[in-house]
Amino acid sequence: MRTPPRPEGLYPSPTVRYTQFMVETGHIQLLQITYPHTHSRFRMYERAHFAACLLALVLFQRAESCDPRPVLVQVPNTVPAGYFITQVTLNGCTAIPVSFTSSDPDFTVNTDGSIVTLRSLVISTKRFSVLVQDNSGLDWRVEIILSCKNEDSQKSGSVAQKRAKRRWRPLPFSVVENASPPFPKDVEMIASDSSVNYTVHYVISGQGVTEEPIGLFQLDQKTGMVRVTGPVDREKNPEFNFIARAFDQNNREVDQFLPITVMVEDVNDNAPEFTGNRFFTVEERCRAGTRVGQVNATDRDQPKTPHSLIKYILLNATDMFSIDQSTGIITAKSNTLDREAQDKVFVGVEIRDMGGAPNGLFNRGTAVISLTDVNDNPPTFKEKLYKGTIKENLANVLVTRIPVEDKDLVNTPNWKAVYEVTKGNENGNFRMETDPKTNEGLLYVVKGLDFEKTPVMNLEVTARNEAPLVGTDAKWQSVPLQLNVEDVDEGPEFNPNIMYLKVKENLPNGTVIGTYKALDPETKNSNGIKYYKLTDPGNWITVVESTGELKVANTIDRESSLVHNDTYNITIKAVDESKKTGNGVVILQIEDVNDNIPVIQRPDLNMCNRGDAVSSVLVEAVDQDKPPYSTPFIFELGAEQEGKWKLKDITDSSVVLQQVEPMPNGMYTVPITVKDLQGTGKEQIVNVRVCSCQREDSGVGICGARSASVSLGNYGILALVLSGLLLLLLCLFLIFFCTTKRDKLQITDDTGTGGILLKSNTEAPGEEVKDGTLLLIPTADVVDGSFQSAVTESKNVNTAPGRYGQQFFQSGGVYNTTTQEFGTDQYYTSGRYDNKIYGNGTLQKFSNTGTLDTWRTNGCYLDRKLAYFGEQEDGRYADDLLKNYGNEGVGSSAGSVGCCSILGEQESMEFLNTLGPKFRPLADICYTTNKTGK
């Protein structure tokens, strides 16, 4: 094999840095040639016959490469912790080792290559390796073989020891995995030094011989040749450990057993395999270089060799993602990943060993990358202009729905819209909501709109998302909305809706304090509008029905409990001709006048008797007026109290009343004049009780109980005697009254009219009345005053068809006057008066049970009786007698009560038998007169 030619005298010889022998193809690959001064690199490939290449490789390795040999060490059977085993060196190598790593955790390797035990061990045989790495990054593996020392041999002397050392030859055994037939194949020959002096035969046992896999290795007992009988899989058995023994012809073991380790040399017979999860997520619009995930793969071939060196390659989507060829980490290649364009990306990944060489084994798989949503799309309106219609005065109703489109993930904050009326809602007439299902904007009217003021409202609606915009230059969008207000027939409206009036308290009744008018929104005038009060807690104001004028009806008192913060509210109702209504509020701001004087709060006070020391009490006053008609107060002591009492410590509303000199216990009357700031006030009496106090509570004395004896004086005894005499007289009077009481007289009443007519059994013929109509007098004159006060009289006047005027009277006077438009139905029955009134859209019905009808019925009956008996003609009982009949009324259920209607053809007086017990005495008198002719 040759290096590339070079110009003579210009460049030094190139250095071959790396060669590779392809066992499968039988080629040598010269990967790198470096010229020292320029570091130029050339790659050359030469092909030759397999045998020639193999020979060249052996010669090349002999000259240039480093091949550490296995190290055989004999140690005691029991090795303590910290025991030095041996030192690893790279004999014949120019490389400088920088790190050592033991494959057995029971041993550690120091920086100088010395191997030391980490714990106490019992060793018969043991094998492990040390990985050595030089300063250029290349590494070698040194095999360490431990065997137990033979103590007997050590005691026999130096000759025996020297013989034991050369008893077995070094045994660097290895086989290539998956070797091709034919089998068996020779592996290595073993020989014992005893074979020089003895005829020996060899026996092997252990793994691969007498243990699984049984029979893989065979031994020629005479020659010591170890053979392999079949292909070996390194991934299952990277090495085989068995022992060899030497026996003489008498089957005596002539030497110590030899531990044999057969290493299986790896070939690239396993393709890389994917491991772990290949489903990844990353946000759309993420920055370039953002880590997406890592593809993991393994190769069963020998680690840290080209056979297991994996290279990761993306097969597609290379414009969106990139992959680290050595680690398999996938990263975003740009910041333009768009979930709305493609929410999942299926990326093909190839994993190839041999560092990605064309002859490397490979596998392919798919990584699924899901793009998560960010709010990179604002909601957009489907129309450029929206319109809606609503009737005026409607509130809390839906006006219109505004649809939008949003490409972001549904039902996430990136998709959910939030709406706002950004223009035209200065008065707060509207509110916006979002339909959670359709994401539409819902426009509601929360305050009624006025067609007369704004028939058309131009609004602007803006749509946003719950989440802020990310990774986009787009802005929130707005759309105009035209809302047409429809006119409706409205009721009257007060302007202003709340009117404030300043009034002084105690204004005279009838004083006009203002006018509160309502206007028809359509006509802009107040014609035909009537005004009524809805609320007026104190009945202080009256409203003129036709004009809305407000007048004082009762005393306005600022200090009343109905007044709050000097204001008093009245609600007025306006009604137009179509019965539509509107309400307004009048707030009276009552101004204070000096109509109250200061009043002492507690006119009865207790003063503690302190013996020789003077005492005092606090006198407090209040005035319900406000400043300047109240505090500070002026306190003055009555003129006669000089020398007894004095006032001190005067404040705005209190004064201290103090004794001039100590006073004995007792009641004292102290006049004190209290005036407000305007000098208005009067003299008031303070009753001061001087007593021996049990205690004082907040400066107020609590007097003790007074001991007193009760005895009767002369007047008391006299009062008791007089009371006894009066009681005795009362008892005598009651006894007399009970013993002289008259018996009750039972009077029967068959007709039921005796409850009103007076009984009389002493009637006799008297002067007959000529004109019976004299008894037809008004009922109110018949009924006495005591009965009249309990009876309601009705006087009716029919003014026109379909129109009825009526007045109601009571003992207190006229209490109602009405004129009805649709007539009145009334009727009299025995014991009932019914009156139905229809009009003004209301129904009123009055039913009064009274005895007035009974009086009228009996009066009619008596009129006819007296008219008959008042006739003076001799033939007054004749059939052709002219008879007078009174007005029986309307609808009488008793029928005719004419006294003469039951007379027969004869002039007999038998009809009197049917008149009842009330008129039998009169009938008897008349009948007797007729028979006697008197």
UniProtKB/Swiss-Prot annotation:
Disruption phenotype: Morpholino knockdowns show increased embryonic lethality, with embryos that die developing one of two clear phenotypes following developmental arrest at 10 hpf. The first group show severe epiboly arrest with desmosomal cadherins and enveloping layer becoming detached from the external yolk syncytial layer that continued to undergo epiboly. This results in a population of cells at the animal pole which maintain cell division and some gastrulation movements. In the second phenotype the enveloping layer is attached to the yolk but does not progress through epiboly. GO terms for cellular component: desmosome; plasma membrane. It is found in: Cell junction, Desmosome; Cell membrane. PROSITE patterns: CADHERIN_1, CADHERIN_2. SMART domains: CA, Cadherin_pro. Expressed at low levels in the brain and heart. Residues 167-716 are extracellular. GO terms for biological process: cell-cell adhesion; convergent extension involved in gastrulation; desmosome assembly; epiboly involved in gastrulation with mouth forming second; heart contraction; heart development; heart morphogenesis; homophilic cell adhesion via plasma membrane adhesion molecules. Glycans are attached at N197, N296, N316, N509, N565, N569. It is a single-pass type I membrane protein. Keywords: Calcium, Cell adhesion, Cell junction, Cell membrane, Glycoprotein, Membrane, Metal-binding, Repeat, Signal, Transmembrane, Transmembrane helix. InterPro entries: Cadherin, Cadherin-like_dom, Cadherin-like_sf, Cadherin_CS, Cadherin_pro_dom, Cadherin_Y-type_LIR, Catenin-bd_sf, Desmosomal_cadherin. Gene3D superfamilies: Cadherins (2.60.40.60), TCF3-CBD (Catenin binding domain) (4.10.900.10). One of its GO terms (molecular function) is calcium ion binding. Three calcium ions are usually bound at the interface of each cadherin domain and rigidify the connections, imparting a strong curvature to the full-length ectodomain. A component of desmosome cell-cell junctions which are required for positive regulation of cellular adhesion. Involved in the interaction of plaque proteins and intermediate filaments mediating cell-cell adhesion. Involved in the formation and structural organization of desmosome cell-cell junctions during embryonic development. Required for embryogenesis, specifically for progression of epiboly and normal convergence-extension movements during gastrulation. Required for the development of desmosomal-rich midlines in the heart. This is Desmocollin 2-like protein. The gene is dsc2l.
